[in-house]
């Protein structure tokens, strides 16, 4: 699907070429667009960054076709915006591309009245699409947590069920303008950003920046010279659909950096880079031989430089899930509680135990045992008042437990019964998982006694905890 959409977009961009050249270059651009660190790296992985790009490519195709035909209809704009809104409702990380699309439309529409009309139509249809896929869940979240985006933007809505925080992952957002300007080059060689982005390598962003910078510098000098002769600006020589895509790309890159900076969220830009490389090369030189040579050099270099995201892979087997859990340990499922104090993503194991078993995740991206949110208050009330069987899911030796395991044991007055544990086998986690039976320490509160607060400290770290 992505290949077909990219091929169609590229075909529109190269519509003035000869049929064979247009189809050949469109196919080449689509292939190179999908041969990138993100699309290759996420094949067979659990992320959905590449799948959601369908909600970016489809609206872009509708818009560039309308711009190329000079007959862009309001219906096409509504449909494109509606699709974009639905995609953003499914995965909000594509919001920067929706904003960039609106900015690109404002830039290529000639009249102020047309711009205002396009903006109003785009905004209304986008909101409708967003509510189609996300409205129900926003209402549920508001009803339960008084935050329609829970837990995100909780610094605005201030739900008592989470910390007063935006919960945004801004760990790789550029801190300075210089860092932002250097970001396209940060994945061309080993850097801290490349390492934090699954050891990726890619030249396409750097190549685009170099070409664009070259053209802008040349444009400045030519503009000074041609202004006296009344010549149009050089960038006006690009077709309207090419200018639209170029503005979209630049605006998306800027907004994406400001909001996230997370490499895999830029999957649409990775795929759209090849046709824009060709557009910039064609604007840079009019000589056919030079164009062919430069495009060939850029495409071959980009192809050879690609290093996909370094994702852990599972070997092929009879079943994706190969999990063995100790069902014999669960003698009374409705009265069984399993605690996950370690922040590792082990909750998938719940699907392999009886559905009546209750699981509580105490330390994760949403909440920590040291928090004072309603979530932790509910967890404390549950644990202190629980009279059934309790287990801890952790490593096979207390000496390699995470500090959060120890904190939970101490805070709630719990102890493991060292003679009662059961191994868990899963190819999705490192060997050594165990289900430990828990008991209350002598003198620890429990049953009908009030729940004291947890230890008010944050763990210092603890031994490394591999997946």
Task: Identify the role of each PLM range.
Residues 18-20, 59-76, 109:
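Membrane-interface transmembrane helices that cradle and orient dolichyl/undecaprenyl
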Residues 2-12, 186-235:
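Hydrophobic, aromatic-rich transmembrane alpha-helices
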Residues 297-367, 459:
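Membrane-embedded, lumen/periplasm-facing catalytic core of multi-pass transferases
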Residues 48-55, 87-92, 96, 243-246, ...:
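Hydrophobic/aromatic-rich transmembrane helices and adjacent perimembrane loops
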Residues 97-130, 138, 275:
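Perimembrane helix-loop-helix junctions
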Residues 120-191:
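Membrane-lumen/periplasm interface segments of specific transmembrane helices
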Residues 6-37, 54, 243, 247:
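Transmembrane-helix signature of polytopic, membrane-embedded enzymes
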Residues 76-92, 98-103, 132, 146, ...:
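Membrane-interface alpha helices of multi-pass inner-membrane proteins
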């Amino acid at each position: 699907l992505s290949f077909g959409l990219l091929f169609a977009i590229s075909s529109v961009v190269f519509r003035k070429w000869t049929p064979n050249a247009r189809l050949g270059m469109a196919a080449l651009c689509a292939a190179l667009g999908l041969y990138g660190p993100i699309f290759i790296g996420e094949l067979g992985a659990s992320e959905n960054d590449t799948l959601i790009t369908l909600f970016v490519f489809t609206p872009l195709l509708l818009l560039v076709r309308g711009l190329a035909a000079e007959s862009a209809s309001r219906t096409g704009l509504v449909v494109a915006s509606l699709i974009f809104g639905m995609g953003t409702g499914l995965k909000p990380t594509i919001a920067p591309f929706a904003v960039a699309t609106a900015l690109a439309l404002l830039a290529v529409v000639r009249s102020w009245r047309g711009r205002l009309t396009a903006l109003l139509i785009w905004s209304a249809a986008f909101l409708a699409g967003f509510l189609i896929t996300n409205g129900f869940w926003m209402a549920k979240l508001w009803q339960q947590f008084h935050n329609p985006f829970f837990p995100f933007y909780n610094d605005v809505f201030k739900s008592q069920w989470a910390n007063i925080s935006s919960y945004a992952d801004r760990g790789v957002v550029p801190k300075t303008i210089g860092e932002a300007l250097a970001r396209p080059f940060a994945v061309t060689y080993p850097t801290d950003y490349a390492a934090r982005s699954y050891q990726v390598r890619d030249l396409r962003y750097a190549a685009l920046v170099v070409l664009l910078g070259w053209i802008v510098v040349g444009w400045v000098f030519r503009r000074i010279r041609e202004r006296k002769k009344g010549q149009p600006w050089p960038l006006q020589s690009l077709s309207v659909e090419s200018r639209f895509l170029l503005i979209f790309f630049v605006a998306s890159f800027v907004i994406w950096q400001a909001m996230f900076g997370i490499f895999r969220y830029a999957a649409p830009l990775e795929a759209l880079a090849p046709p824009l490389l060709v557009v910039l090369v064609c604007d840079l030189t009019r000589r056919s031989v030079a164009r062919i040579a430069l495009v060939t050099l850029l495409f071959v270099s980009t192809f050879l430089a690609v290093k996909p995201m370094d994702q852990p892979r599972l070997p092929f087997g009879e079943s994706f899930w190969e999990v063995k859990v100790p069902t014999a340990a669960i003698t009374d499922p409705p009265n069984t509680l399993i605690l996950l104090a370690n922040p590792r993503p082990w909750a998938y194991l719940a699907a392999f135990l009886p559905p009546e078993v209750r699981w509580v995740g105490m330390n994760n991206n949403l909440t920590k045992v040291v928090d004072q949110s309603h979530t932790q208050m509910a967890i404390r009330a549950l644990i202190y008042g629980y009279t059934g069987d309790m287990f801890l899911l952790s490593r096979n030796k207390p000496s390699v437990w995470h500090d959060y395991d120890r904190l939970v044991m101490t805070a709630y007055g719990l102890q493991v019964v060292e003679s009662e544990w059961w191994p868990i086998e899963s190819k999705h986690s490192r060997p050594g998982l165990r289900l430990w039976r828990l008991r209350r320490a002598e003198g620890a509160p429990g049953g009908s006694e009030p729940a004291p607060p947890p230890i008010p400290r944050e763990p210092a770290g603890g031994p490394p905890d591999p997946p």
